[in-house]
Amino acid sequence: MSEILELEAESRTEFGTGAARALRRAGRVPAIIYGAGKTPVSISLEEKEITKYYRKPAFISQLINLTIDKKKYKVLPKAVELHPVTDIVRHVDFVFLEEKTQKMEVPVVYEGKERALGVKRGGYFNIVKRRVTLLCDVNNIPRNVTIDVTNMPMATSLKSSKIELPKGCSFVTKKEFVLATIIGRRGAKTEAEGEQQAAEAGK
């Protein structure tokens, strides 16, 4: 589960390009919070702080307690705009969390893919899904979905129905889908092909 990040923000009442530039010159980043049937709230964040957290893994699935004018709101990052050259955060969209569950796009970590059985036999580990969309309990939002693939053999597919998700999470789609495959490289032999050729050579 993601640890809850504590951030402070300030309300803003001036809008438009000029106001945004003035904020950035002052070392702050314009942002907005919306969703859950609430009136959108325009805020600003300290630039160095939000850029530091954005550069950490899985920021987009990070649960945040955002303090605005001494009031706390539970939010999630929705979209981040970056400077095209410096990668400094220029604007952030957040969503309010009021429901018990939240739809989330979460990174997938394929643990042991370099040493998977099929890869050791000359196969290629092909990633089909780098992120998956989950329905999660707001108090149990994972940073990622980690899947151990060390025992995955050649010419097989890793399907969603075989994945054990973190507690309180489920796939949004009920339809089965493929996350990864191990396919043979050109010139690579499967174990069965190798045995067959050895048997023929011994005749």
Curated annotation (Swiss-Prot):
- UniProt entry keywords in alphabetical sequence: Ribonucleoprotein, Ribosomal protein, RNA-binding, rRNA-binding
Q: Does NAD show up as a keyword for this record?
A: no
Q: What are the protein's GO molecular function terms?
A: 5S rRNA binding; structural constituent of ribosome
Q: Which CDD domains match?
A: Ribosomal_L25_TL5_CTC (cd00495)
Q: GO cellular component annotations, sorted alphabetically? A: cytosolic large ribosomal subunit
Q: Reply yes or no: does the keyword Thylakoid apply.
A: no
**SUPFAM superfamilies hit by this protein:** Ribosomal protein L25-like
Listed GO biological process terms? translation
Highest taxon, organism lineage: Bacteria
What is known about its subunit structure? Part of the 50S ribosomal subunit; part of the 5S rRNA/L5/L18/L25 subcomplex. Contacts the 5S rRNA. Binds to the 5S rRNA independently of L5 and L18.
Family, similarity comment:
Belongs to the bacterial ribosomal protein bL25 family. CTC subfamily.
| Role this protein plays | This is one of the proteins that binds to the 5S RNA in the ribosome where it forms part of the central protuberance.
Task: Please report the name of this protein according to its UniProt entry.
Answer: Large ribosomal subunit protein bL25
